């Protein structure tokens, strides 16, 4: 599904004021907002809010209402953001990524794996997650921390993407796991990656558009849930996600910008989860909480 940018073009001063309006109305729900300079000499700026395509109509209506009092004369414009193969892009010229004992590498870098490292081979494909992004690397580091301190008997990787986190959990813990994604392409890619990494038993892959999927009930509740998604869906799904965590279990949350951390924490503290640790990487955070 495409991502949409709704934006208003104006001066720097007005863009800052509009950003404040956007922040008040959308940031708490996890929408990203931003300003950018377009033309320094002419003082042209854009204030933007980002959402998925199926949310555009609702967000645009709310934005128009929020801007009506002071900025109704400024039109709301839209841009459909390009769908980029981030896997291929992230692997261009990048060395293997090391996070704790894990090393995530492409097939061209197999010879760079050191003795004692847990190697995960992920090549360019159609699903997100090569370890180069701060969220994936943060999850790998946090997974190692959880494994050292808590007993884990089964794992859920929610929004598995390339399958890198599910594969990492299996290689480290050797316990049954369920890896789900709303995208059937991602599910297929993740399953293929698991086989390529020698994981032929113990991991189940399922396309699951929501928690009503029977896969969650069949394989859960889970001692460890890993969800590297985005702040807004993480907050929205908090009650259902927590319901699938076993008593005393853990959840690793990522896909969260540093400034969104407190909002996500509030959503899960509201479900009576306790914060254990936060890892900060390149403007992103990975959070560990327990039930």
Swiss-Prot record:
A molecular function (GO) term: protein-lysine N-methyltransferase activity
Gene3D superfamilies named in the record: Vaccinia Virus protein VP39
EC supergroup of this enzyme: transferase
CDD domains, A to Z: AdoMet_MTases
Binding site for S-adenosyl-L-methionine: 136, 159, 181, 228
Gene Ontology biological process terms from the UniProt entry: methylation
UniProt xrefs under NCBIfam families: PRK00517.2-1
Function recorded in the entry: Methylates ribosomal protein L11.
Protein name: Ribosomal protein L11 methyltransferase
Name of the coding gene: prmA
């Amino acid at each position: 599904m495409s991502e949409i940018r709704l934006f208003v073009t104006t001066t720097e001063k007005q863009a800052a004021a509009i950003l404040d309006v956007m922040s008040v109305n959308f940031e708490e729900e996890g929408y990203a907002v931003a300003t950018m300079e377009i033309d320094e000499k002419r003082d042209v700026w854009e204030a933007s809010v980002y959402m998925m395509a199926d949310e555009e109509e609702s967000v645009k209506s709310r934005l128009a209402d929020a801007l009506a009092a002071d900025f109704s004369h400024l039109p709301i414009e839209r841009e459909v953001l390009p769908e980029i193969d981030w896997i291929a892009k992230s692997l261009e010229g990048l060395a293997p990524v090391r996070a704790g004992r894990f090393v995530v590498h492409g097939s061209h870098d197999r010879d760079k794996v050191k003795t004692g490292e847990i190697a995960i081979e992920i090549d360019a494909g159609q699903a997100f997650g090569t370890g180069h992004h701060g969220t994936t690397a943060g999850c790998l580091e946090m997974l190692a921390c959880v494994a050292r301190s808590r007993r884990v008997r089964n794992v859920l990787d929610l929004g598995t993407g390339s399958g890198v986190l599910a594969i990492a959990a299996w290689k480290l813990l050797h316990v049954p796991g369920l890896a789900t994604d709303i995208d059937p392409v991602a599910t297929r890619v993740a399953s293929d990656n698991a086989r390529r990494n020698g994981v032929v038993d113990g991991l189940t892959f399922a396309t699951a558009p929501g928690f009503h999927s029977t896969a969650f009930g069949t394989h859960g509740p889970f001692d460890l849930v890993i969800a590297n998604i985005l702040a807004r869906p993480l907050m929205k799904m908090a009650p259902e996600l927590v319901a699938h965590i076993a008593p005393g279990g853990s959840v690793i949350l990522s896909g969260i910008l540093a400034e969104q951390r407190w909002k996500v924490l509030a959503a899960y503290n509201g479900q009576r989860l306790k914060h254990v640790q936060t890892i900060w990487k390149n403007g992103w955070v990975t959070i560990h909480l327990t039930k």
